[in-house]
Design a protein with these regions (language model features):
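Conserved C-terminal RecA-like helicase domain
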Residues: 8, 98-188, 209
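Switch/connector loops and helix/strand junctions flanking conserved nucleotide-binding motifs
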Residues: 3-4, 33-38, 84-87, 195-196, ...
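Conserved interdomain linker/interface between the two RecA-like ATPase lobes of SF2 helicase motors
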Residues: 51-135
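Conserved RecA-like P-loop NTPase helicase motor core
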Residues: 159-234
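Short glycine-/polar-rich loops that comprise or flank the Walker A/P-loop
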Residues: 19-23, 50-52, 69-73, 155-158, ...
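Alpha-helical scaffold elements adjacent to nucleotide-binding pockets in ATP/GTP-utilizing enzyme cores
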Residues: 9-13, 40, 139-146, 174, ...
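Post-DEXD/H (motif II) to motif III coupling segment of the RecA-like Helicase ATP-binding lobe
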Residues: 3-70
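A short beta-strand-to-loop transition that corresponds to the Sensor-1 phosphate-sensing loop
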Residues: 27-31, 133, 189-190
Length: 234
């Protein structure tokens, strides 16, 4: 939060003239760096602001530690076969979804089907999906009810949705209901950090992500240790 422009509010905490601190330690799972020559920006590899690096722990070391610090993980991809695509279009099932979600793309629909296949095959219990917008995240939630109706062979999936502008009490209810059972939680960015639900065993990126920091932070939701969890799936 402190990295970036020296004039941003969070950077205020690093300036000795603002807050007098004798000793300070910084801990992060996602080091943020600024590349450039400007003195107007702060970067975590600058010892003038953040001090010298005293310890670093890799993902591999955290997984292989005895006992482990985080869960091992697998990166998986699921696709839709040609026969499945033909069956979906020939039976007009895609059109049924389009009647409800007029702006849904074939790719979004295929992603929802692929997630159901992954849940069924890998016995995933609690998944969270990340989307590039709140609207797409909420649409993905609505899709799940339609898929349950159109493809009963995939079983039922409880779906929840949270967003940053939700009242805190409403968001807490959604998170509690999700944590107490099995299902899917959709969001845009509000679950990227600050969430500690060990039961989460799958993270889904429904839209391309280019930020390494965002990817690591989001993937970390599925790497908390939990009884019975062998892998976190990404």
């Amino acid at each position: 939060k402190t990295v970036g422009s020296k004039t941003k509010e969070m950077a205020h905490l690093l300036h000795q003239k603002n807050v007098r601190i004798k000793k300070c330690i910084f801990m992060t799972a996602t080091e943020r760096l600024f590349r450039g020559d400007s003195d107007e920006f702060m970067s975590m590899d600058d010892p003038r602001d953040y001090g010298s690096l005293i310890y670093e722990l890799s993902f591999k070391e955290a997984i292989n530690s005895k006992p482990p610090i985080i869960s091992d993980y697998k990166i998986i991809t699921f696709g839709i076969t040609t026969p499945e695509i033909e069956e979906i279009y020939q039976s007009n099932k895609y059109l049924e979804v389009k009647k409800v979600l007029k702006d849904i793309t074939a790719r979004e629909f295929a992603t929802a089907i692929a997630l159901r296949k992954a849940i069924k095959k890998l016995k995933i219990k609690n998944a969270i999906s990340f989307h590039r917008s709140i609207r797409r995240a909420d649409n993905f939630r609505v899709q799940q009810d339609l898929i349950t109706k159109i493809f009963p062979s995939y079983g039922k999936l409880k779906s929840f949705h949270v967003r940053g502008d939700m009242p805190t009490s409403d968001r807490a209810i959604q998170m509690r209901n999700f944590a107490e059972g099995e299902g899917l939680m959709t969001n845009a960015r509000c679950l990227t950090e600050g969430v500690d639900l060990p039961a989460i065993d799958c993270v889904v990126f429904t839209d391309p992500k280019r930020s390494k920091v965002d990817i690591v932070q989001a993937a970390g939701r599925a790497l908390r240790l939990s009884k019975g969890k062998k892998f976190g799936y990404i």
